[in-house]
Amino acid sequence: MHTHNNFKTPSDEDELDDLDEDMVVGVIAEIEQEVLNESDSDNDEYDLVDMGAPVPDNDGDISYEGNDSSSSDDSFDPNAADSDSDDSMLDEAGGVTAGGATSAKKRKDDDNPSGSNKQPEATFDLDEDDETDETVRAMIAAIKKPRSSPPEIKLEDFITDICFHPDRDIIALATIIGDVHLYEYDNEANKLLRTIEVHSKACRDVEFTEDGRFLLTCSKDKCVMVTDMETEKLKKLYETAHDDAINTLHVLNENLFASGDDAGTVKLWDLRTKNAIFELKELEDQITQLTTNEQSKLLLATSADGYLTTFNISARKMYVQSEPYEEELNCMGVYRGDSKLVVGTSKGRLYTYNWGQFGYHCDMYPGIKSPISLMIPITDRIACVAGEDGNIRACHIAPYRNLGVVGQHNMPIESLDVNASGELIASSSHNNDVRFWNVKYFEDFGDIKYNEKHNAYKEQRHNLPSSKCSNASDFFSDLTKENADGDDDPGAGPSNMA
């Protein structure tokens, strides 16, 4: 406390001038001691104990050790760390204000006397006003709305290919480390059934036989593996099936399948034999896809060197090869009652061929601006294509129309497949995820006429029901509907009275 040497009042100014300086200092010290005693006496015994202060004697006086409070100030060290006794004193002090030092752990233990760390659960209660709010009702409806497709599957390893089982709700996921994961999918949850270690290097393609009994895989290790789905054991191993890394497989029926490698070689296999039925090398670059129609008389192959090559299976020789294209032919599909073949390219184009006339295309559609690397037929006239832009788009075949976006990924799409019923699409991306899209609504799509007017720009950006994005027009249509409802309300708007 800072004190003045001359302590005066206006009434006795002259008398204080004659006082001795030591006497004034003594009087001030006595006043300070009396103030301190009065403030301490206001605290009861229990408060003093909790605060760590000395306990008063029976007569109410407090005993102190040492000379006075100034002596304790001499031993105070501002740089010294707080002692354990100080911490315990702060933790035990209860009922403190915002400036107090109540321990967080102490408060937590007081809230949970049993010692449990479980926090009280938050509840979301709606009153009558909230339940009538349009936004709240829309949120509740979205939460209660049942899922129309299985949830996403996420793996640690890069997914190279996917394939649906023909009879069961099972999907196979091939990975870059050579394993195949079998998942049972459902709208509520997905279940990992088993993981099969099949190859020593990246598994590039996975296929089920038509009856679903066997699982076929090919790899960069040049092998083809056949696994029994019932016993989960290796049925057959075609070791060094190709001289180069195998890129793609195609199942013709329950016994026959074809394979293509990175050097342009195509082979046909029979599960009942040890060696290939025949081998043809008419290309110099990677075989990107193999396919046939229902009759399975011709085997078609697209390649990275820009050729569409057709093989006669029964004659075991090449049937016809197309004119070269200055772009990679990546994928294809058969449509319109096996009368049309459509090929997707690295420039985003779609070429159409009449069946049996594979030398040159009869029609070309610009498609999308990004490369098309995947294509699957959904119906006889609707195809889904995907590629590097991460979008799955639906196209109407002959005539060509962009129907809209089926689904999307944040990264390029690596594989695409449709289940046996044609109602569910699965896609995987470079983000190691598999997403499912319910496309049952395509059953209600009518046929498109050649002379129908359409807006190509709008169609390319239109989001279909399975898409995770909504259209801006849907928002404005809701506003228009609300305005129309308001116009019908006799109590809305200005009065019509004359």
Swiss-Prot record:
UniProt xrefs under InterPro entries: WD40/YVTN_repeat-like_dom_sf (IPR015943), WD40_repeat_CS (IPR019775), WD40_repeat_dom_sf (IPR036322), WD40_rpt (IPR001680), WDR55_POC1 (IPR050505)
Keyword annotations from UniProtKB, A to Z: Repeat, WD repeat
One biological process term in Gene Ontology: defense response to Gram-negative bacterium
Pfam families on file: WDR55
Annotated Low complexity bias: 67-82, 93-103
Positions of the UniProt region annotated as Disordered: 1-131, 478-498
Superkingdom assignment: Eukaryota
This protein's record includes keyword Repeat: yes
Residue windows of the WD repeats: 154-193, 198-237, 241-279, 282-321, 324-363, 408-447
Ranges of compositional bias, category Acidic residues: 12-23, 31-48
PANTHER family: WD REPEAT-CONTAINING PROTEIN 55 (PTHR44019:SF20)
Family label: Belongs to the WD repeat WDR55 family.
Record-given protein name: WD repeat-containing protein 55 homolog
